[in-house]
Structures are given as C-alpha cells and as structure tokens.
Amino acid sequence: MRSAGREPLPRRSPRWRRASPLCETSAGWRVSQLRRDDLRRPSTMKGKERSPVKPKRSRGGEDSSSRGERSKKLGGSGGSNGSSSGKTDSGGSRRSLHLDKSSSRGGSREYETGGGSSSSRLHSYSSPSTKNSSGGGESRSSSRGGGGESRSSGAASSAPGGGDGVEYKTLKISELGSQLSDEAVEDGLFHEFKRFGDVSVKISHLSGSGSGDERVAFVNFRRPEDARAAKHARGRLVLYDRPLKIEAVYVSRRRSRSPLDKDAYAPSSSVVGTSVGSHRHAPGGGGGQRSLSPGGAALGYRDYRLQQLALGRLPPPPPPPLPRELERERDYPFYDRVRPAYSLEPRVGAGAGAAPFREVDEISPEDDQRANRTLFLGNLDITVTENDLRRAFDRFGVITEVDIKRPSRGQTSTYGFLKFENLDMSHRAKLAMSGKIIIRNPIKIGYGKATPTTRLWVGGLGPWVPLAALAREFDRFGTIRTIDYRKGDSWAYIQYESLDAAHAAWTHMRGFPLGGPDRRLRVDFADTEHRYQQQYLQPLPLTHYELVTDTFGHRAPDPLRSARDRTPPLLYRDRDRDLYTDSDWVPPPPPVRERSARAATSAVTAYEPLDSLDRRRDGWSLDRDRGDRDLPSSRDQPRKRRLPEESGGRHLDRSPESERPRKQRHCTPSPDRSPELSSNRDRYNSDNDRSSRLLLLERSSPVRDRRGSLEKSQSDKRDRKNSASAERDRKHRTAAPTEGKNPLKKEDRSDGNAPSASTSSSKQKPPSQKQDGGTAPVAASSPKLCLAWQGMLLLKNSNFPSNMHLLQGDLQVASSLLVEGSTGGKVAQLKITQRLRLDQPKLDEVTRRIKVAGPNGYAILLAVPGSSDSRSSSSSATSDTAASTQRPLRNLVSYLKQKQAAGVISLPVGGNKDKENTGVLHAFPPCEFSQQFLDSPAKALAKSEEDYLVMIIVRAKLVNSG
C-alpha cells in the first residue's frame, strides 16, 4: 500500500530527467526562458550538490525513495494505505508542506514572468524535498545542512525582488576551472558584463574543504539595478565553452526582520545570502566561515516566512530587464563613479597574493584630487620589463608611456610609472591590479604626479551634455582654442590657450555635476602634441547656433571651406580657436549697420567684415601660421571669382535687415549663456542686446562674409585714389614750418620737434582718420590725439595694422625711439619679442619708471586698428611683413589678454650704438592698469573697449638712473 502512495512520483521523473541537464549546466544559455524560469530553483541546488558527470537517470529513483523516506518521517507512524498516507502528509506535515508550497509560489512569482502552469508549480514545491534528500538524508538532522538551510536559501533568493532591505551589486561566478589564467577569465567576464553598466571584475581564491582553493570571480556593479539586469539577462553563461555558475552576493544595509536574528551575522562576513545555485556548506567546511541564512536559525526563519506568507506579504516580481538604450548610454567600459566594489572580498577570504583594499583606494576619481592618468607602480620585481607591464595593463586601455626606475646602489626597491591615455583607464587599472602579483611580487599602485598641459580630458559625459553647455561651463576659466567632442560621446578634449586657464579648469571642474547630481565630471590633463583619433571632430560652435539646431546645421558641412582652403583638415579646428574669445562680444559702432552710409565709412566696413571672416575661418592661431602665409590679396581673389555664381544660386545671402529679426529671436534667450572669461567679467560694460547684434552682423552667413571681403577690396581701391589726391593736397600744406607748434593743439601737425617725423606723420594721418575717425564724434576728438606712428605690429607670423596716437608725455620720445637703429629713419614695423606678466609688482615697477623718467622721458600712446593698405603704402615694408598673415588688431588684443601679459619691444628697432637713446615699449591690453591713462576723447577714438592697446615708451637711460 505504501507503494501506491509513491506511485504518482515516477511519472514526474521524466520531468526531472529533462531538467537534469539544467541542473548540471546551470550556467548554460541554450534553454528557453520558460524552462529556465520553471526549473531555476531545483536546478540550482542539484547542480551544486551533485557532480555534473554523474548519470542523470539514477536521479529519478533517488528522488522517489527520498520522497518516500521524507513522507515516512513526517508522517511518523501513520497508516499503511495510500489514503492514510495522504492524510498524514496533509495533517502531520502540514506545516512543512505549507512552507514548501509557499516558498515555491514565492519563487514562482519572482522568476516567472509569463505565468507558469500547474505542473510547473507542482514541480517547484516538491523540489526542496528533493534537494534535501539528495544528500543521502544524513544532513536531515542538521539545522544548517538540511531542509532548513535550503528553505532559507530559497527565501533569500527571492529577497532581491522583494527589496526587504537587502540588495546586491555583486555577482559571484564560480566553476571557472583551471585551464584559463586569471587575466583571461577577468577580461572575458568584463566584456560579457560591461554592457549592463559600470562594472569591475576581481578574481579571488576561496579556501575550500576539497583538494585546493576554489577560484571565483566577483563582478561588481555600480548600481543594484545593473546587477539585477545582468543576472536576469545572463542567467545562463558559457565562457570559453564552459558553463559557469552565477550567484548574487547580497549585502545587508539593515538588519533582517527575522525574529531570531540576534546573532545572525558572522563577525567575519557581510554576506547574508546567495541565490541561483548557492552552496550547501561554507567554502571553509562546516559552515563556520559565512552564514547563508539571514536568520541564523532555520526554524525561526521558517516561522517568520510562514507568518509573512499568511499575511500575503509576498515579494513582488523582479523588474524587467533594463531597456537597450542602456547600452547606448553606457557604451564606454570604464567607471562613471566607483563605489566600494571590492569590500566583500577580504571578508570572504582572499588568496595569498591578494592584498586587502584600503578605504583611501575607494575614493572615486571625481572626489580624488590626486587622480590622474599616471599610475605609480611600487614593489616591482627587479627583473620586470616594459613588456611585462604592458602585457599586464594593456587590457585596461591605451598605454602611452612606461618608465621603470631601477634601484641604484644602496637601494633595493624597483618602481615605475605607467601613463594611460585618460583617467578612466588608469583608475580601472588601479582598482583591478592593486595587489596583483607580477612575476614574483605583489605590486602596490597609486597615482603619480599630474603633468599640467593646456589640453584637458573631460570624462563622465553622455547624450545629456550638448556641446554648447560644455563650452559654456569651461569657458569661464579662459579662452578655449578647440573642443573635440561629439554629442553622445563619453569624453571630450578641451584645448585652452594658456596653462593657467587649463589648470584652473582642472581644479574647479573635477566632480562638477553636469547633467544631474549623479553625473559628475572627471577631468585630467592630456597630451597636447598627440591628436586622438575620433570618428568626427566637431569645431567649437557659436552659442546662438547651438541653441537652435536648425541654424547650427548649415554651418557644420560648410562646403566653402574645402573650396577655399587647401590646408590639412586638422587645421580647421585651429581656425575656430578664437570663436569664443571675449572680443567677439564687443558692440559694433552704429555706422556699420547703416549700409546706406557705406560710402562715408568705406574704410570701416572694409575691415569689419574682414575681421569677421578671419575670426570665422582664420582664427587667431600662432601655432599654425607656418602653413598659412598667403597674402590677403591672393586669398581674396578666389572669393571674388566665386561670388557671382554663388550669390546667384544660393539663398544664404540675406541683407542685415532681413536677417536681424530672425537671428535676434535665436539670441534673445541666451544673454546669460554667452561665454565670459572670469578674469574679464568686470570689463563688460555693454548690454547684452548690443552684444547680440554684433554677433548677428558678424555671423550672418559665409556669402555675406565674402561679400564684405569684396566690398573691402573695392573700398581699398577707392581709398588709394582718395589718398593719392589727398597726398598732393598735403604736400602744399606741409610746406610751412611745423616746429614750435603744440601737437595737442593742431591736428595737421604730428611732431613739433622732428621735421622728418612731422612730414611722415602728416602724410600717414588722413588714412587713419578714415579708418578710425569716419564718424563725426571721432573727428571732433582727433585734435587732442595726434598721430604719432603708423605701421605694423608683428607677433610671430602675424602682422596687425595699427595707428598710435599720443595720450600723455613727450611726443619727442616716441619720435626719436620709433626709428630704425641703423639708419635713423622711420620704422614701419614693430615686432613683439617678449612678454611681461601683468602682476602687481611688475605693474608697480612700470609706474615707478614713468615717475622717475619725468615729463620728458616717457610717452604714452593709444594704438587703434590701422588701415589694411598701410603695408602696401609703406615703402619700408620688409620681407618679414610680406611673409606674415595680416590680422585685425583685436586678435592681438585678445591674445595678450588671454596670456595676461603685455608685449615688450626694445627700441630703437635693430639696436643702437648710442646707449643714451634707447628705451623699452610696453603694449598693454585693456586692463585696470591701462584704463587709468584713458580719458573720454581717447575712449571715443578707440570706439571699442576691446580693440585698442596702451603703449608706454620709457627712455632706458632714465630707467637705469632710477
């Protein structure tokens, strides 16, 4: 009769035989989702308890006998027929079966996404008995090794879905085998799990009761949801054709609600439970190393579980796998932010070669001011080579430099430095390789010393960061030359003009929350001479173009650049380096917008569009001028030839009146978004509306820029004709003696002491009036500011037409020093060869020299933009001027402001044997020091707060005497 009670069980044995391959290869991927969900829990325990190579059919008989033995034990001395046996099962063992059924329902609700059939539930709640009896029944009396542990393990496996204060960020991968090396396993697991989020892999050796240590891998995620998604999506994992076992390692953030968990946690472990094939015994043997049950006593947890199930408090089903956009947003395999990922390993048990992590090593790179792309490697083996280090570290990223320091006499330690391409690579290598054995020694890893450069690497970016936002945040620290960034990339490179600006951005932008509090930036220095390969290098945009994408779109594929320029593509980025300088935000003079008055202001309109064109495509670049030395006349010719056909066939050419309302709508929401340099914020006295109008005029369209260039060339021809006629008139006026007249009283005379200088200055003055004084207010202020010099200022391979007007001091000082040292004739160009930092002690020294020199020993001049044809009209132009590129004066002003320095020129040019007649010229950009020399007439002559230089000339003999 007892056999009748066991008769239905063999009919379920084929189900078990079919499930046994899952039990043996619990990490395989070749099983459907339904079978995986139905058989997850029984396959887990059976796969751990039995060897995968044992026969599968013997399992059914053993399950049947074990079930019979269990029914006898639970039934006590029940009846001998089938009905009495059934009553015994439902009566005497109601409590145990209720637990099994409830646990199976809980597991079914957690893992079955589409619902299961009744047969699957029947199979599920009978599985704990099978698992418990498979051990031979000897662990039945043990509270840790029998059904209590399996039930507690089953309950713990449902904990992640329930969220009862228990979560996991770590997956334990076991059954790795011994054929593959630790690095090969770590690298393979990293590539398998990196798509789910920020992940790190650590290999550990756990001491076991078998022949040796068991090698396991801990896959640590930054977020618990990433770990859950990886566990559900990678429930069946085959690595190198070897099925692996995946377990979740739970970390308790608060104590369990079990009534009997007073002594639940072992002092040496923070692991409270495992799922999906958890061990029945502790790795150390006997279960003394870690506790797999949150409750400490299996019976107490079972009572608590029954109580919770009776109240209907079942854990909710697990969340669905994260959307596939996760891979697109996290397509980089490095850390966004590192949590204490490896804190479990030393507690679980570390191998002999694994050094425990310290808390200082777990600081995220967003918070660690020492974090950079250079790693310090200590305790290296004396025989280590560069190839050894590259083999060990090249899987973490691109290694740019390896430096090994061999021990000298009296030293015993070998250390080295390893430089990666960026901070993400070095940080991941630091966490993964700290304590690893290379050759014979476990290495110690720390951060090296950062090497400041003008180029920054910025990490922690993503689709949420537009290019305009990146430029706006980093432009506060100085002038940006280029930004290499494509929206959606995880990193960017920002090139500054100065090292101070880059260092300030490196200091203040580390950890900056760009896009939210959990999206913080990582900043490090990068190599300036190395061009990193990217699929697309986007130039630094204009702010109003980026705010409205449809207007920004027509600038990126600019076909006119390739038609005009023949320079390499890398130079295009350099040409946009000055697009975000502060000089771009200067309000324009009103006559520029009145095209009807073009005849009266031909010289002004001639250089304003040229200024815009040069800033647009030939931005201020001192590094690339060797490859771009075309003369302005030759560069304007192709523009003239293309203009008629392009203006007739394209619709980009619009008048300023038609374009102004449309673009003002784009610019109106962005007054606060315009880039401002922190060092120059106090100098912006113009309102934002005027700044926006300047942008509209200068950034209208490429065709408008070329039309301005054509108008410039046409106006140059008219200027030459006018200057030729004016030249004849001035010859008659300058016949009278000019000595003894006050230069500040009479405009027609520029020098009261030197006749040759007077003649030269008077000849060159009317073009300056056309250039700088085309309006009535400027002409009215000209009598107070006589023209002292006209020519070219040179800096490296660029020349800047300028005119100098006397502000203070003696004009004789300027006339006697602004000459050729060898011939004594008037000099046509002044080359800046040195810079003077605008530090307060140095400014005080300049002030002291002016006071010591006295009223006849110095001259202060105001340099404003000169006419563009001054070089051609000057008879003393040299080969240096002919080989350089002409640029507007505001580019020189912007360069000096960005460098926070003044240009220095030794006078006279070329040196002088007469030591008594020497001096120094300082060219100061707009700053607090230079503002003290400007009065209202001088400001009216300058027309703009960002388009002038203050020149201070002091005689050297007076300097030496002071």
UniProtKB/Swiss-Prot annotation:
N6-acetyllysine PTM sites in chain numbering: 449
SMART domains registered for this protein in UniProt: RRM
Residue positions where Phosphothreonine is found in the record: 567
Annotated positions of the Omega-N-methylarginine modification: 577
Gene3D superfamilies assigned: 2.40.290.10, 3.30.70.330
PROSITE patterns named among the record's database cross-references: RRM (PS50102), SPOC (PS50917)
Keywords: Acetylation, Isopeptide bond, Membrane, Methylation, Nucleus, Phosphoprotein, Repeat, RNA-binding, Ubl conjugation
Protein role: RNA-binding protein that acts as a key regulator of N6-methyladenosine (m6A) methylation of RNAs, thereby regulating different processes, such as hematopoietic cell homeostasis, alternative splicing of mRNAs and X chromosome inactivation mediated by Xist RNA. Associated component of the WMM complex, a complex that mediates N6-methyladenosine (m6A) methylation of RNAs, a modification that plays a role in the efficiency of mRNA splicing and RNA processing. Plays a key role in m6A methylation, possibly by binding target RNAs and recruiting the WMM complex.
Descriptive protein name: RNA-binding protein 15
Gene for this chain: Rbm15
